[in-house]
A protein has these predicted regions:
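N-terminal beta1-alpha1-beta2 submodule of the flavodoxin-like/Rossmannoid cofactor-binding fold
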Residues: 1-89, 137-140, 147-173
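A general structural signal for short secondary-structure boundary/capping elements
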Residues: 107-112, 145-147, 167
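Short, glycine-/small-residue-rich phosphate/pyrophosphate-handling segment
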Residues: 93-139
Length: 173
């Protein structure tokens, strides 16, 4: 999310970052949390979003999720389900949508998590910003996928950061 924010701001696009509440993350075994301690304060300082109604005025929406058992996290799924009361009115129709995910391994279900977020966006009537094959890094068309390692100890490298910037250059806002 930080890389997206920095890249979009370099393009003079105003950016707000939100996170969903994730009580599950607080219960993870310590060996998962060791590698993320340095990011804990930064993460917790991000405003929690509770409902889809909070993002109706944005021109573009980028969602990101860790991969839990081959899908988006439970809290992300609950957030997507919070749009059910606004779905019929289609207030997000035509807005740009992109997504990103992390997974422990290449075959850890990251593409399925990306597809779940894309399907959600399609049901909302949003316009998908696919990842073309020309974007550096060999990402799936569904969104940017970062392989974080079994213990989430692999951070995005320079190639990933360049890939994100290449992808976001396709925005027309």
């Amino acid at each position: 999310a930080r890389e997206y924010k920095e890249a979009l701001e370099e393009m003079n696009i105003e950016v707000d970052i939100f996170r969903v509440s994730d009580e599950v993350a607080k219960t993870l075994p310590q060996y998962y949390l060791i590698n993320s301690k340095e990011y804990k304060d930064e993460f917790e300082s991000i405003n929690v979003i509770k409902s889809g109604k909070e993002i109706l005025d944005y021109d573009a929406i980028f969602m990101g999720s860790p991969t839990y058992y081959g899908n988006v996290s439970g809290p992300m799924k609950m957030f997507m389900d919070s749009f059910s009361d606004i779905w019929v009115g289609a207030p997000l129709s035509g807005k740009i949508f992109g997504c990103f995910a992390t997974a422990g391994s290449q075959h850890g279900g990251g593409e399925l998590a990306l597809q779940a977020m894309n399907i959600f966006a399609q049901h909302m009537g949003m316009t998908l910003l696919s990842v073309p094959c020309s974007v550096r890094g060999g990402y799936p068309a569904y969104g940017i996928l970062h392989i974080a390692g079994d213990n989430s100890d692999i951070r995005p490298n320079d190639d990933a950061k360049i890939g994100i910037r290449d992808y976001l250059k396709r925005l027309n806002i």
